[in-house]
Design a protein with these regions (language model features):
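Accessory nucleic-acid engagement/destabilization modules that flank
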Residues: 1-257
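Conserved pre-motif I regulatory segment
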Residues: 258-295
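Walker A/P-loop
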Residues: 288-310, 447-448
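Conserved Walker A/P-loop ATP-binding site and its immediately adjacent core
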Residues: 321-343, 355-366, 476-480
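A substrate-engagement module of RecA-like helicase motors
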Residues: 340-408, 414-418
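Post-DEXD/H (motif II) to motif III coupling segment of the RecA-like Helicase ATP-binding lobe
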Residues: 432-438, 445-520
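C-terminal helicase lobe and adjacent C-terminal extensions/tails of nucleic-acid helicase motors
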Residues: 481, 541, 545-611, 635, ...
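Conserved interdomain linker/interface between the two RecA-like ATPase lobes of SF2 helicase motors
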Residues: 492-567
């Protein structure tokens, strides 16, 4: 059967783009041509990786990569694939449809190699290796090229998807194109242990380059569909010309600027903080991977210190870019705003770097959308010089989270990087994005057992690839630090141990290289030393009284509650009590639609933010954990439900955060003129010998949110003993007194402690099973399983809800403005929804079917809540999603 009877791409509803179909042989050469130019231009370091594998000549490397790409779609020669599209000029026209087991063409291609093409040595490149050894080397490359859809091909037994004429056509095609690449060879080193190890390490990056070549070579705007028959060498020359234009789709690599001092990035810093000074002085000129752990208080300039380190490493040729991973989308948005004023200084003025915001809701952030500039067919369009930061993010990066990490500078959730070491689809693209890049991870003390284990896997992988990692934290426990250092040492295959630190060893900087560990104290400035007194309240009535007293004095006050329901209930009580007028009262929690959440965030910053002035007087905010990390708020007074000590330290950081005068106006320097800051904690009455129900009997919802009741009791004990949170002096003491391995737990919590300890080790073990096995390279053996539902976080499943209004019988989004449907979304816990779903009017029947068709949602899973202006609908702009609560 002729190679010209097999299609590779069809029109699929496109009105332009060439003929009805694109011959498989031409599509294969399109992708090969893209790969050729990727090597010539060293796009995403593909030439560098091939040099590491021993192909030093660039032309030879380009020909080899192009040749191996010709194999990527050999699975499409299968009859099972070809019958998916019919055309009178193709080989299956008028043939009856046959039933085949549904198998991806990527796996079919790998199967064709294993069962047929591997026995055709005439297809192999010339080599001094024997046929048997050449076959073994080729077997290494086959998963890399055939597994081009984000996952390695499965190793399955031969099936009947290929007729003999299909196998012959595939062989004929590969034989014809071999002559196009006269320089290809199989180096002897690829069959030696060291060469195989090197290949397995680099196969992840090369497989990602294969994906990029396939995506680009599949674009009909560059490669119009062609059904015409012609000699392969004729089409190859055409493909090379088209591909030279197509690769302009890839934004060119930016050139790193020289590091000339702190003013390069931060011209406003006149006097570096002690931590920033350490970042300027550290010896970074060592070979291989490095790990830095920066532990310091809020206000010590950790972010700036980390970026100073990153720029120094980049300027020394140890990285081309960085990715800044944060715990939440809100903190990522805030960091994106901060980076927008700094990142261009990392590169030379004539460069065109990209700054990407990488998380699932980035399209809802206006500043990110404004920063996107497109790369056109010619590749000559430059960013609009009138845009906020002269350059921005190439649209090529922005159209998919899969490609987001490929931008020079990324800011997003840590989850986006963690997905690189888990069996998510296209994890190889994420790994390629992290290669030659510094990973910065902020607030890592907040990681639970599951996330910590995944983070350790990421640190290990970064180290094994020779990359630097910078970890930022308020305070780490000894156990947390030990595990991070151990992960790095596994990556560099060295034995390195973190030193045992005492309670006075804080702030602290740790630097780990392949040969040594440097651990040193960091000085503290007087300005960031804080002393917050602790007060205790044992009833909600006492808390409400305290709020009334604060309002009477003209102070602004926050009460951070552990559960949404508790927050809503207290908000309503305050409204009824008239302690505070409604316009001075704000409620903020996680069960608001994005539209309302953004509005409330803005209100919160306006009333409680750094620049707030007279308008803050007498204001009250009832909030949940959503304000712990992302918002720079500054309250005169604060109440908090009892929470684990690290969270209380974080919450206390929002209490009298900035220096103000007695009227609440910000001062540039001097002493704060307000009353001594006191964090008042709502907690059960103290009990030296608590029973198992110590917390649940007094604070039922808090007991559910924080099930490790022993740690809650330990938190109350150490804060009662100390009476203050003194930073940085008592930071290590507070953390180790709650999370240390040698703490004594009361007998009443023995059962709870056993359950929590079991959960801790179970979560870590389960997370460990989710990590990829990188040792065999990019192949089917990388993971024992590919669970349908994977997550970077071990939390209860959530449900996505859309809010809609019915206006003149038309379903319209709750939110107004741009991205209205996305802004009308909120997510709730599955268990909460199961309990309350019957309390809402939901779209169903034909209206739901139409809505799903318009919004490209699955009607079996989509839930659209109909809301009105009446509270009975279960949602309000002031209270969020409440259902029938309180009715």
């Amino acid at each position: 059967m002729s190679i010209y009877h097999y299609w590779g791409k069809s029109r699929r509803g496109e009105t332009d783009g060439g003929d009805d179909y694109h011959l498989l042989c031409w599509h294969s050469l399109d992708v090969a041509a893209v790969g050729y130019w990727m090597v010539i231009n060293n796009i995403y370091f593909i030439d560098h990786y091939l040099k590491k594998l021993g192909i030093q000549d660039k032309e030879q490397a380009a020909q080899f990569f192009a040749w191996i790409l010709c194999w990527h779609d050999i699975g499409k020669f299968a009859h099972s694939f070809q019958q998916l599209y019919r055309h009178e000029a193709l080989n299956i026209f008028n043939e009856p449809t046959r039933h085949y087991e549904k198998i991806a063409h990527t796996t079919l291609g790998y199967m064709l190699w294993n069962s047929w093409l591997s026995e055709c040595p005439e297809l192999f490149p010339p080599s001094s290796l024997s046929v048997r050894k050449s076959k073994r080397v080729m077997a290494l490359w086959m998963p890399v090229t055939t597994g081009h859809h984000g996952r390695p091909p499965e190793a399955i037994q031969e099936l009947d998807h290929f007729r003999q004429q299909d196998k012959d056509a595939a062989r004929d095609f590969l034989l014809r194109i071999k002559a196009l690449f006269p320089l290809i060879t199989l180096p002897e080193a690829w069959d030696e242990d060291e060469g195989i190890d090197q290949f397995q390490q680099l196969s992840w990056f090369i497989s990602a380059a294969v994906v990029l070549a396939d995506w680009t070579g599949s674009a009909s705007r560059y490669f119009p569909r062609t059904a015409e028959k012609m000699p392969v060498d004729t089409y190859w020359q055409q493909a090379l010309a088209k591909a030279q234009t197509a690769i302009t789709l890839f934004p060119s690599a930016a050139n790193v600027s020289a590091f000339t001092g702190i003013e390069t990035l931060f011209p406003f810093i006149q006097h570096p903080t002690p931590l920033q000074q350490k970042a300027l002085e550290l010896d970074i000129n060592v070979d291989g991977a490095q790990l830095f752990i920066l532990e310091d208080v809020t206000g010590a300039g950790k972010t700036e210190a980390a970026l100073i380190l990153a720029h120094r490493l980049m300027a020394a040729g140890k990285a081309q870019g960085l990715y800044f991973g944060l715990p939440t989308m809100a903190t990522a948005n805030a960091m994106f705003e901060r980076m927008a004023n700094t990142w261009l200084a990392l590169y030379q003025p004539d460069s065109r770097p990209s700054l990407i915001l990488a998380h699932s809701a980035r399209r809802l952030m206006d500043r990110f959308n404004q920063s996107i500039w497109s790369v056109t067919l010619s590749g000559t369009e430059e960013p609009d010089e009138a845009q906020p930061y002269s350059q921005g993010c190439a649209a090529w990066f922005a159209d998919s989270n899969k490609k987001a990490l490929l931008a020079e500078v990324g800011v997003g959730t840590l989850d986006q990087a963690m997905m690189a070491v888990m069996p998510f689809k296209h994890n190889n693209l994420r790994l390629l994005g992290l290669s030659n890049k510094i990973l910065l991870a902020d607030e890592i003390h907040a990681c639970d057992a599951w996330m910590s284990r995944i983070l350790e896997g990421l640190i290990e992988r970064q180290a094994s690839n020779g990359n630097a990692t910078i970890l930022l934290s308020a305070t780490l426990s000894q156990q947390q630090r030990d595990k991070r250092v151990a992960a790095f040492s596994r990556g560099v295959r060295r034995s390195v141990q973190a030193p045992l630190l005492g309670h006075d060893d804080y702030p602290w900087l740790t630097q780990v290289t392949q040969t040594e560990l440097i651990s040193q104290r960091v000085d503290t400035r007087k300005e960031v030393e804080r002393c917050v007194d602790i007060g205790w309240l044992h009833s909600e009535e006492a808390c409400l009284e305290r709020i009334g007293e604060a309002v009477e004095k003209g102070n602004c006050i926050a009460w951070i509650r552990n559960s949404v329901d508790d927050a809503i209930r207290i908000y309503r009580q305050l409204q009824l009590s008239k302690v505070v007028v409604t316009e001075n009262l704000l409620l903020f929690h996680s069960r608001f639609a994005f539209y309302d959440r953004q509005r409330i965030e803005s209100q919160t910053l306006n009333l409680f933010g750094k620049q707030s002035g007279a308008q803050r007087a007498g204001k009250v905010i009832i909030a949940t954990q959503v304000i712990e990390q992302s918002l720079d708020i500054d309250c005169d007074e604060m109440i908090s439900d009892l929470a684990p000590v690290d969270l209380l330290i974080q919450r206390a950081g929002r209490l009298q955060r900035h220096i103000r005068d007695r009227n609440g106006l910000v001062k540039k320097s001097g002493q704060d003129e307000r009353e001594t800051p006191v964090l008042r904690i709502l907690a059960p009455e103290w009990d030296d010998a608590p029973r198992e129900n110590w917390l649940s009997s007094a604070m039922r919802n808090s007991a559910y949110v924080y099930p490790d009741h022993g740690r809650m009791w330990l938190t109350q004990r150490i804060l009662r003993e100390q009476g203050t949170i003194r930073m940085p002096q008592s930071a290590r003491l507070l953390i180790e007194s709650v999370y240390g391995e040698d703490v004594n737990m009361p007998v009443g919590f023995a059962k709870t402690e056993q359950l929590q300890e079991g959960k801790f080790y179970c979560d870590r073990a389960f997370a460990g099973q989710m990590l990829l096995n990188f040792a065999p390279g990019y192949c089917a053996e990388i993971s024992d399983s590919l669970p349908e539902k994977m997550s970077t976080r071990l939390a209860e499943e959530s449900v996505t809800l859309w809010l809609a209004k019915i206006v003149d019988s038309v379903v319209t989004p709750y939110a107004s403005g741009e991205h209205a449907w996305e802004m009308s979304v909120l997510r709730v816990r599955q268990s909460w929804w199961n309990k309350h779903k019957d309390e809402f009017e939901k779209l169903d029947g034909e209206p739901l079917r139409k809505w799903c068709a318009q919004q490209h949602q699955d009607k079996d899973f989509a839930t659209v809540i109909v809301v009105t202006d009446f509270a009975a609908c279960g949602y309000s702009a002031n209270e969020g999603l409440i259902g029938m609560m309180g009715e």
